[in-house]
Regions:
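Structural alpha/beta core scaffold segments of enzyme domains
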Residues: 1-202
Length: 202
């Protein structure tokens, strides 16, 4: 459309490009500029980003500010999780980029724990940086890092052993399939056994 050419007349030849890890899922403005230049000059145009240009143009991930609160009983049973998140979406929209960041963060927040209630406030902010998009598990590590740090903090405040606190709240095998407050479904898993084994080997 940008070039005034019918889509059926455009041929894309894609050779082996190696692993993508998400950053190659995006149509970047530079692609359009190269196509426009080729059309204007009437000859093939090739653009290969230098390493420093790659960091200035290719989508990235994980520029997120998270604040959370974990509510639990005196016995250490999780009651609720509240999270306020501000996500840097970059300077422009990259297709599914912002959606992927916010969706993955949302779905991963309960982790593998029984959390009856969850409140989440998400704010996406456009800035002057490179765009956020699918890149090496975008949104997932941010959510789990926050959750696990909250659990460690709760263990310190309550005096309950940090592994024991997790074992009390992890989704048991007999509860499978388990649907989280955010709609994610765990169909199977033996998380308590894995934690017990980790403790034994530590």
């Amino acid at each position: 459309i940008s070039l005034g050419i019918e889509p059926a007349r455009i041929r894309v030849i894609s050779r082996d490009v190696g692993g993508g890890f998400g950053s190659r899922n995006v149509i970047y403005p530079e692609y359009v500029a190269v196509l426009w230049a080729a059309r204007k000059l009437g000859r093939p145009v090739k653009w290969t980003a230098r390493r420093d240009e790659e960091f200035q143009t290719t989508s990235q991930a994980r520029d997120t500010l998270l604040r959370g609160q974990l509510g639990l009983t005196r016995d250490g049973d999780f009651l609720a999780l509240r999270v306020d998140s501000t996500c840097n979406l970059g300077a422009y929209h990259t297709g599914n980029g912002p959606f992927t960041q916010l969706r993955n963060l949302t779905r991963m927040l309960p982790g593998v724990y029984k959390t009856p209630a969850l409140y989440l406030e998400l704010i996406g902010v456009f800035t002057h940086t490179v765009p956020i998009s699918s890149y090496r598990g975008v949104g997932r590590m941010e959510a789990i890092t926050l959750l696990e740090r909250l659990i460690d903090k709760a263990a310190a405040v309550t005096g309950i052993d940090r592994i024991e606190l997790r074992l009390r709240n992890v989704i048991p095998p007999e509860a499978m399939p388990h649907t989280t407050p955010m709609g994610g479904v765990y169909d199977s898993g033996t998380y308590s056994a894995n934690m017990a084994l980790t403790r034994e080997k530590a």
